[in-house]
């Protein structure tokens, strides 16, 4: 009798552990590829800077189209588990193609298409985790927050490992390592993640349901808010290394230390935000994130020493920790009947942020300076703050 009573708990714990591993492995697969992609294109494919920029923009646009198509399909019919498994398979194919092919146009077409399907595994995993948590009575906020923390942990480990594999061995070894991550991820999905059929109503935890027109308006506004926040962050990520080296004349090692510290601090900030979300609300937390981001970008402009630049990463961690942890939950609660679309919509705000940042970056630097980009980032956060004030807190 004792054995029977403990079995469900063990099954639930095993399933939760599987979700955490899938989140980490999909994060590692992405963290291995993204940081070195521009170097791969320039060194291995001999792509010119404009071709590198076009590759990133094309990847973002294709990712938005593919992920939104799959999200609508998954919310209406089908099993998310099967979809995640297929996305992992596409990830293996994409990494294998990048490992051996050196034709720019093949990678831009076939490679980007396969990678776009592969990247959808992550938002679909979060959607399945939310549905599973609702069905089993788990605390959805902290469960989703812990899952998102695995992505951040992957980005602490992934980039240094990517550079070590690519520069110490070869890009082929790096991409095959990412392919192995997708294979292991697919096995875990197949063996341990639950199947939840779309035609069975999901019993969700209590969420305040707004009238349809209000929810659509708030969802659009939240999309603008998160897109502006990601655009500001991406402007910083693109230009911070050059600003540190060319403007402040500090070492390139400092840029890696800044990214590593921010990623490490982001995890506890994310968990703290998840813990206090029900007490102070999502909107106030997002407002705190925006204010922290504004203070961070303004302070970076005034800082001149490595110690201060490193200390300021606490503000960056607050900004990113709340955006990554609470932003997705905000979308899901605004669209409770379309969890897949909500999660994918949040993921696409990051892609839109890359498109915006990449489009204005080169022009701003040519006309003005790196300083102007930080002020532009602050202005983007100002737009995000105004839009946020018109969104109902739920």
From Swiss-Prot:
**UniProt-listed PROSITE patterns:** MFS (PS50850)
Question: Which residues are listed as membrane-spanning?
Answer: 11-31, 50-70, 81-101, 105-125, 151-171, 173-193, 225-245, 254-274, 284-304, 311-331, 371-391
Q: Which one of the record's GO molecular function terms can you name? A: carbohydrate:proton symporter activity
Question: Per the record, what ranges lie on the membrane's Cytoplasmic side?
Answer: 32-49, 102-104, 172, 246-253, 305-310, 392-394
Annotated compartments: Cell inner membrane
- For the keyword Cell cycle, the answer is no
Q: Does the keyword Cell inner membrane apply?
A: yes
Taxonomy, superkingdom = Bacteria
The record's InterPro entries line, in alphabetical order, gives: MFS, MFS_dom, MFS_trans_sf, Sugar_efflux
Task: Give GO terms for biological process.
Answer: cellular response to glucose-phosphate stress; D-glucose transmembrane transport; lactose transport
What single Pfam family name could you report for this chain, choosing any that match? MFS_1
Q: Which UniProt keywords apply?
A: Cell inner membrane, Cell membrane, Membrane, Sugar transport, Transmembrane, Transmembrane helix, Transport
Where mainly located?
membrane
Its cellular-component GO annotations read: plasma membrane
Q: How does it sit in the membrane?
A: Multi-pass membrane protein
Which ranges does the record list as Periplasmic topological domains? Answer: 1-10, 71-80, 126-150, 194-224, 275-283, 332-370
What is the role of this chain?
Involved in the efflux of sugars. The physiological role may be the detoxification of non-metabolizable sugar analogs.
Family membership noted in the UniProt record: Belongs to the major facilitator superfamily. Set transporter family.
**What name goes with this protein?**
Sugar efflux transporter C
């Amino acid at each position: 009798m004792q054995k029977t009573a403990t079995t469900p708990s063990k099954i639930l714990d095993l399933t939760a552990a599987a979700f955490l591993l899938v989140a980490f492995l999909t994060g590692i697969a992405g963290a291995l590829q993204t940081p070195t992609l521009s170097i791969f294109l320039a060194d291995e494919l001999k792509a010119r800077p404009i071709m590198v920029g076009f590759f990133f923009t094309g990847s973002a646009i294709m990712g938005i189209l593919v992920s939104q198509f799959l999200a609508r399909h998954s919310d209406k019919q089908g099993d998310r588990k099967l979809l995640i498994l297929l996305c992992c398979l596409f990830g293996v194919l994409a990494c294998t193609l990048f490992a051996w092919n050196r034709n720019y146009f093949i990678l831009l077409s076939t490679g980007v298409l396969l990678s776009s399907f592969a990247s959808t595994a992550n938002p679909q995993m979060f959607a399945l985790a939310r549905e599973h948590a609702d069905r089993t009575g788990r605390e959805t906020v902290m469960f989703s927050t812990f899952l998102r923390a695995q992505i951040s942990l992957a980005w602490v480990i992934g980039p240094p490992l990517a550079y070590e594999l690519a520069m110490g061995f070869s890009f082929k070894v790096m991409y095959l390592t990412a392919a192995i991550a997708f294979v292991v991820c697919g096995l875990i999905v197949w063996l341990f993640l639950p199947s939840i059929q779309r035609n069975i109503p999901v019993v969700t935890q209590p969420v305040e349901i707004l009238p349809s027109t209000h929810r659509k308006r708030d969802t659009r506004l939240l999309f603008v808010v998160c897109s502006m926040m990601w655009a500001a962050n991406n402007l910083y990520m693109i230009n911070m290394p050059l600003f540190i080296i060319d403007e402040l004349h500090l070492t390139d090692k400092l840029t890696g230390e800044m990214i590593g510290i921010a990623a490490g601090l982001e995890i506890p900030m994310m968990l703290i935000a998840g813990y206090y979300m029900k007490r102070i609300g999502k909107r106030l937390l997002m407002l705190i994130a925006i204010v922290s981001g504004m203070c961070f970008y303004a302070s970076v402009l005034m800082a001149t020493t490595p110690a201060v630049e490193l200390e300021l990463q606490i503000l960056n961690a607050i900004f990113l920790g709340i955006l990554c942890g609470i932003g997705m939950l905000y979308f899901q609660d605004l669209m409770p009947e379309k969890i897949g679309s909500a999660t994918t919509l949040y993921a696409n705000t990051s892609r839109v942020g890359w498109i915006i940042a990449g489009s204005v970056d080169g022009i701003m630097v040519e006309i003005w300076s790196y300083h102007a980009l930080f002020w532009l980032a602050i202005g983007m956060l100002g737009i995000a703050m105004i839009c946020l004030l018109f969104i109902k807190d739920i």
